[in-house]
Amino acid sequence: MKISKILVLGSTGLLGNTVVRELSKNRSYHVTGTYRDPKYKQDLPCEYIYFDANNRDIRDFLSVNVGKYDYVINCIGLIKPHLTSTDIAIRVNTLLPLEVADIASYFKTRFIHITSDCVFTGNTGNYTEDDEHDMIDLYGRTKSLGEPDNCMVLRTSIIGPELHSYVSLMDWVRRNKNLTIDGYINHFWNGITTKQYSEVCQQIIDNNLYEESKFHIHSPNTVSKYELVDMFINKFNLDHTVCPHSTPGNGINRSLMTVKSLNRKLNIPGLQEQVENLD
């Protein structure tokens, strides 16, 4: 049995903590994760090495390590609540994936990079790979510019459990002390859970689906944020009540579609099933 050596960048974040946990269960993988804060490395179920994407000189680390692996999966990204510096946002969201992609190409290591639906304003919805990026805020622009042509770029939106910080929607709902929570009925979403994203990566590796191109990865159904919050409440047996709420205007619809065949091959289940399968 061939063992695939996999390096997961950003193993203690929202996405990375689930990716290393799920991939480490696969006996045909040898998984190594990276950490930035030492106090979280004990939570990793795999080997780990230190890496700080905020460092201005990341090339030495990447040049030494990337070539040791069959796959590198990037789970590092600065999300909107953590955007405190334009310089750091550019380094992490734009320059890091471009640098990893170039070094991975040199070593013939396969590089899987996640990007965001927030490159779109959400004015229309049902965006495909051919649609122009029209978001002009810092997060959207840095993510848009950080989509290399020489690796596999997966555009999606994710929900899942965090190890720390707890700023994502799901953990915000779980930790909310208010018994009544507003849920937007005119904000629409068809992303996937972090556990499902881990499954996507495994299918790409196991079924040799890797291809240097950009792909939209999404659930088969679109839900409102109101419906999504209600799923969390039911899944985790919370005492909260979600109340329908609308933002002014037409709301936000960043739902994704695809003109490519990959998403169909992945057989992603509906959102209700994905939420129920969360740990």
Residue ranges and their predicted role:
Residues 88-99, 133, 141-144:
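Glycine-rich NAD(P)-binding loop of the Rossmann-fold in SDR/ketoreductase-type enzymes
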Residues 5-26:
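N-terminal Rossmann NAD(P)H-binding glycine-rich loop of SDR-like oxidoreductase domains
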Residues 238-279:
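C-terminal amphipathic/interface module of NAD(P)-dependent oxidoreductases
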Residues 98-134:
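Conserved Rossmann-fold NAD(P)-dependent oxidoreductase catalytic core, especially the SDR/UDP-sugar
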Residues 136-138, 148-189, 195-196, 202:
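NAD(P)-dependent short-chain dehydrogenase/reductase
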Residues 33-40, 53:
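N-terminal Rossmann-fold cofactor-binding loop
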Residues 50-94:
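NAD(P)H-binding glycine-rich loop region in Rossmannoid oxidoreductase-like domains
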Residues 198-203, 207-253:
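Mid/C-terminal beta-alpha module of Rossmann-like enzyme folds, strongest
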